[in-house]
């Protein structure tokens, strides 16, 4: 694993991590409550992007911590994972006025965005990832140089960018509808028509608008 990670490599880490995170969260929800809960961050596709960013970040530092004692690796992974989770929560709240997780009341919670138990979970996931997934990913990147995977990356990147842009627009209008703000142009009318409140609640069933929760 080299010190530099190319964009196609980072994208595939983000892409696969987002999908794996979607199913990991769903399965964990089934174990805890007996029912599935959608944790996708996009209107189309099973993409829990906080895990995508986390996967890319964990892979990026795996080489840097490989020579450290296990406990130092654990702490480094835990810190990086917590930073990703905190940043994701902060951006979601300030961009869309909503949260998808809130650890308020848990031990050593910081603004409800992270807590000790989830930070430790990131550390454990990092250790497991560095031992199992990172070597497999590195092997794939080394062998995939003979594949047209850069072209595949370009196509998937364009599709993901479109999905994220559409999702952001739909979320923005959903937020505005909470205040009965009418659409201002044809694009917003189309967003309201195709992504009404009922559909958005079905997609983002764990999302709560902060001021509406009070």
What are these regions (language model features)?
Residues 1-214:
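Aromatic-rich, lipid-facing transmembrane alpha helices and their immediate juxtamembrane interface loops
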